[in-house]
Amino acid sequence: MKSKAIKWLGTLLGCLSLVVVVSAIAGPVNDKCLLSGNAVKKEATYSVGFCCGNCQGKFTKNPSASIAKVKAAPINDKCPLSGNAIKATASYKGDLIGFCCNNCKGKFEKDPDNLIKKVKVARKTVNDKCPLSGRAIDPKKTYTVAFCCNNCAGKFKKDPAKHIAKVK
């Protein structure tokens, strides 16, 4: 009798974990912008990745305690002009763009609206380490917050700890 109860409990916990992961992948956790209250837009969202469902669950219960640990990172993993590793960054409409050197950064800053087309977005989450455990993230375990526009998304990115408590 005890083993059946344990198996049942294990199955139930497995299903609940799947629901958490699927709900996180399905879309943002909010339907109103945290800053303006307007309807959210798909293109103005940010995702935080986690190493496991356990850390994701802890974050969901108390996001304010962990969001400060999320380090903003460039949305690209290689310089859009040279293809080299990133060493310098510039801000563009609330996003951080990575460049191999200040020369490429300067070229981008002179013509950002044209050169942004060369940026290949590699990062789906704003972090590459779990904000709770510090381990590498599992891209399937994310917490997505959406915004009505890139302006609000940029404000959130500058001070996420201030705004994350507004997520319902």
Per-range role (PLM):
Residues 1-2:
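N-terminal hydrophobic targeting signals that begin at the initiator methionine
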Residues 5-6, 10, 20-168:
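Intrinsically disordered, low-complexity terminal tails/loops enriched in metal-binding residues
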